[in-house]
Regions:
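Metal-dependent nucleotide-binding catalytic modules
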Residues: 3, 7-160
């Protein structure tokens, strides 16, 4: 979704594609470091019908975006990737039309198409400033949705 969206907006897609792949890497680290605690976070999110990041904050005092941003900083990732990982759930913390906003929107597209396989069953709230900043028309959005689904289907065939 991130690559298709970046291309549709005339942005350089390489780092945005990488940011899209890595935007939830903090979640992976949290699962690896504290699997039992994270299983409880997932259960809490389901029981309370709340976003996973809200349940993460309640349980840990930080969320996967914070962990991902810390990893990106430690690994000396470019600033646009760090911003995307840090603010993909709250793009107004960065620049709504910037990398975080684009990943925020791409994440919503992946969730809407049910491509993410996430335990989180809620569609993310799209940040209004991001919607305004990216200014996608219906035709472009339809094309991005179709390209994203097609790309996912192609990768699924390749990976079996």
């Amino acid at each position: 979704a991130a690559r298709s969206l970046a291309q549709a907006l005339g942005r350089k897609a390489d780092n945005l594609f990488i940011a899209g792949l890595l935007h939830d890497i903090g979640r992976l680290l949290m699962v690896v470091v504290a699997p039992d605690d994270y299983a409880r976070v997932i259960a809490t999110a389901r029981e309370q019908d709340c976003p996973l990041q809200q349940a993460e904050m309640s349980a840990f005092g930080y969320d996967h975006a914070d962990v991902g941003a810390a990893l990106a900083q430690r690994w000396n990732f470019p600033e646009d990737i760090r911003q995307a990982l840090a603010f993909h759930h709250a793009p107004s913390g960065g620049t709504p039309g910037g990398p975080a906003g684009l990943i925020h929107y791409a994440d919503a597209i992946a969730k809407a198409l049910d491509l993410d396989g996430a335990e989180d069953t809620q569609l993310p709230h799209l940040d209004p400033a991001t919607i305004d900043a990216l200014d996608l028309d219906q035709h472009t959005l339809a094309r991005v949705l179709a390209e994203t689904q097609e790309g996912f289907d192609h990768c699924s065939l390749l990976l079996g």
